[in-house]
């Protein structure tokens, strides 16, 4: 496929999404915009002509596209978008320019109805939207509890305040049990299992919460490591040339940074 076509399609779709958000007075993060575009892709379906021109891979942030990110950076460098508290919005001049004509949307009006469903959903402003992306599309079902129970509890004070160590360890065990069997994951699986054993021991001594400060980093590193493996095995063909460097990065991460 012509690589320029990827960027043309993504550029038109990103501009459309930013205009829709501006028109509806919605300001969300770059990562949530990535997920919204991914959801548009998935709802278009594999047989749609645009499906293959919206290349994504799974990362620690969920579905992510380097092509979307590069087009996003280009718009930022051209002062078309502005940031406010980690959310982004289109400036007035760019909105007027971009909303005049969009050949992609004219050719595929179904995108309009799909985007309306996404941007009129109140869950867009909450974790529920992100969680639904994982529940509906993640390549492994345990990625949802791995991310939104194990990992998110380490960064969300509200989740931590309701933490029950036995329940947390049950989720941990389920994730450990469901890890795929792959030679690139062997070393990580051993480390992840050892971490679980240490957490069990701490919990048996009724010291889980007292040691939470020491638990945070290895749990976070576990998610980041697994996400690097998922990227290798769950990506669109556009990224096939990156597999070698991704494998090297994963091996280095396991060797130097894993729990």
PLM region spans:
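Domain-edge interaction signal
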Residues: 1-259
